[in-house]
C-alpha cells in the first residue's frame, strides 16, 4: 500500500504518484510514449490571431521567420504592462505541451509563466469560460488570475522582484480561497538556480499533465532537466485554455508549439 505523504505548508494530504516510484526522467519517458493526439500546432510564423487572443493592451505579439515574439510592456510596476497570450481552443483531460523557447531579455527579476488548463472559478463575473470576461483583464493584474481562475501554473526563466533574486522553476495551483493565500498555492518542490534559460539559447519545453502528475522537461544542446510535481493536494484540473504570461519588461520567442491530448 502507498503511504500518505503530508504537505506541511498546507496541512493537506497528497497521494504518491507513479512519478514518485521511479526517477523523474524514467517516468517522463514513459508518459511521453503514450498515444498523444495533436490538438493544436502553431509554427509561430503565421498570424497569431488565428489561434490565440491577448490580455494586455501594452504588450505586443510579432510573428517572424524564427517564431512568435511575445513582449510585455516596457514599464516596470505598471500592471497594464503584463501580458497573457491565450489559446482560443480549450483542452480536456490529460495534456502535453511542447514548444521551442528563446529568452530575448536579460532581466534578473520578474517571471514568465505558463498557465495550464485555465477556467474561471464560476463565481460572480468569473464564469467558467475565461474568454467571456476578457474585458476584466485588459489590465492583466496578477491577482485577477490567481484569485479567479482554476489552473496549474509553471514559472520558468523566473526571478523574484529584486535584482539579486535567484532564478527558479516553480509550480502553483490556483485559485486562492479564504483559507489559502497566494504564497500557499505552491506545489513542492521549488527548483532554484537550474542553470537553464540563458538569453538567446534555444530551449525545448515539454510539459505533461497526466492526472495529478505534472512534469516539465527542458532541453538545450548542452543540458537536460526534468522537474516533477504531485498536485494531489488540490482538486484535479481537467480542462481549460493554455496561456503564456510575461510580467512587465519580459520578452521571449516561441516556435513549433504543439498541444496534444490523450
Residue ranges and their predicted role:
Residues 4-21:
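Bacterial Sec-dependent signal peptides at the C-terminal "C-region" and cleavage site
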Residues 16, 20-262:
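Extracellular glycan-recognition regions
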Amino acid at each position: 500500500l502507498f503511504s500518505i505523504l503530508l504537505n506541511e505548508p498546507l496541512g493537506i494530504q497528497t497521494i504518491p504518484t507513479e512519478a514518485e516510484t521511479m526517477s523523474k526522467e524514467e517516468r517522463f519517458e514513459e508518459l511521453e510514449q503514450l498515444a498523444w493526439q495533436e490538438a493544436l500546432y502553431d509554427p509561430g510564423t503565421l498570424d497569431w490571431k488565428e489561434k490565440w487572443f491577448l490580455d494586455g493592451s501594452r504588450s505586443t505579439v510579432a510573428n517572424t521567420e524564427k517564431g512568435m515574439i511575445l513582449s510585455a510592456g516596457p514599464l516596470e510596476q505598471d500592471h497594464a504592462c503584463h501580458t497573457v497570450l491565450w489559446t482560443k481552443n480549450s483542452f480536456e483531460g490529460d495534456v502535453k505541451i511542447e514548444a521551442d523557447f528563446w529568452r530575448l531579455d536579460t532581466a534578473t527579476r520578474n517571471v514568465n509563466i505558463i498557465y495550464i488548463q485555465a477556467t474561471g472559478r464560476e463565481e460572480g463575473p468569473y464564469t467558467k469560460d475565461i474568454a467571456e470576461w476578457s474585458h476584466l483583464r485588459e489590465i492583466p493584474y496578477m491577482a485577477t488570475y490567481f484569485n479567479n481562475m482554476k489552473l496549474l501554473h509553471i514559472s520558468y526563466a523566473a526571478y523574484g522582484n529584486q535584482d539579486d533574486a535567484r532564478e527558479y522553476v516553480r509550480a502553483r495551483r490556483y485559485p486562492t480561497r479564504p483559507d489559502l493565500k497566494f504564497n500557499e498555492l505552491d506545489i513542492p518542490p521549488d527548483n532554484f538556480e537550474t542553470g537553464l534559460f540563458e538569453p538567446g539559447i534555444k530551449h525545448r519545453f515539454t510539459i505533461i499533465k497526466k492526472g495529478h502528475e505534472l512534469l516539465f522537461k527542458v532541453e538545450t544542446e548542452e543540458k537536460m532537466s526534468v522537474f516533477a510535481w504531485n498536485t494531489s493536494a488540490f482538486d484535479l484540473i481537467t480542462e481549460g485554455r493554455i496561456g503564456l504570461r510575461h510580467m512587465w519588461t519580459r520578452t521571449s520567442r516561441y516556435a513549433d508549439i504543439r498541444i496534444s491530448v490523450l
